[in-house]
Amino acid sequence: MSHRISHVNAQYILHYDSPHQFEPLLPSEPALAPLLEAAGDLTRKATALGAASGKAAQSELRKLLRSMNSYYTNRIEGEHTRPSDIERALQQDFSTNADLARKQRLAVAHIRTEELCEGELNRRLAEDGDSTTRWLYSPEALTWLHRELFRDLPTDDLRLVDGSMVVPGEIRQRGVAVGRHEAPTWESLPRFLARWQQVYAGTRRGEASVVALAAAHHRLAWMHPFLDGNGRVARLHTHLLLQGWGLTSGLWSPLRGFARNEAKYKALLQAADEHRRGDLDGRGNLTEAGLVEWIEYTLDVCTDQVEFMTRQLHVGGMRDRIQAALAYETAVVKSGVREEALMPLHYLFATQGELGRADFKTLTGLGDRVATSTLSALLNRGFLATDSSYGSVRFAIPRHALRFYFPALWPEAEQDQALLDGEVGLGGPTRSALRRKPLS
């Protein structure tokens, strides 16, 4: 192993093998006050968003956001594919192009893991309460996340460029360097992980724990405990902790914000890797200023995502967006959906409840035969969801309507859908043909 040599407090560090070398794990008191204030602002806004939205909206958006989170976390790694390719992969429709199929499998792996881990987290929260979020800081939890992310991938997908293999859930057994940063020796990782858990799991609940979450994200990436997949694990870990504290309600995730300014995300992570920048930069081995800048950025990203979704879910604005989606369906897609469905659809969104089919048809103001065909078209196009062939209906969010319902939430999916619609509208291949033909 090649060792990076750096000058710290008149001592030369040949390699990282002791937990004191990645101090500070939290900012000192003078730097902490504004961070706690920002964390409090985030918590208040996130709590208000969750309280204002109904369970139905949370359920529908959660499914959509899993695909979006998968797209963005893989984009940060340079392993993303088109949103439509993700949708196909969820239907077990994989490309004949080997590299695209590999990226599709990575996307599905994240979606499956996020759903599974959220379910397990909710189960543990019901049984153990606050101890569950503390458990997420354990080596056991980290290896669980890594194992779930990679366990279903074929052998070829787990092979790195140097020929070595990633073992799902296994702490690395060799030294690694990531860019300019040489991670701790593999023999010392248990000690680093124990210290990481001790500090962050021991932080008091509230604003301090949110600040600790941001710091923990960097220090986890810095340790690089796995041979590969550390960024994916760190981002999923952050997502799950925010959910465990009841701050996301399935309505937002920091993963979108991290990827929206990917260069800044990576630059600040790297800057926080640096050694202390002088006598005024804290008392630890690593830069406190860099850690503070990273925490500020993470809190800003989360707050921005909360504010964005708060605007998107405003009931008044949604009426106009539903109307635009229905107008497009009527004039362009000609799917049988009619604009008279606006009133019952907006009612379902605003109340986050359900309507019997007869009541829904009555609210359209259409005759029974036309109302019935309209209802069927809405179900076929995914504007409505139901649990049975004759059951009540509820508001749903089809991906093709995303650009109308939640503009700019997932711009790449909007562009992808517009391209697909353009191909179909210009007399190109049918949608079923597009599903069979891999898209480059």
Which sequence ranges carry the predicted segments?
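FIC/Doc superfamily catalytic core
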Residues: M1-S440
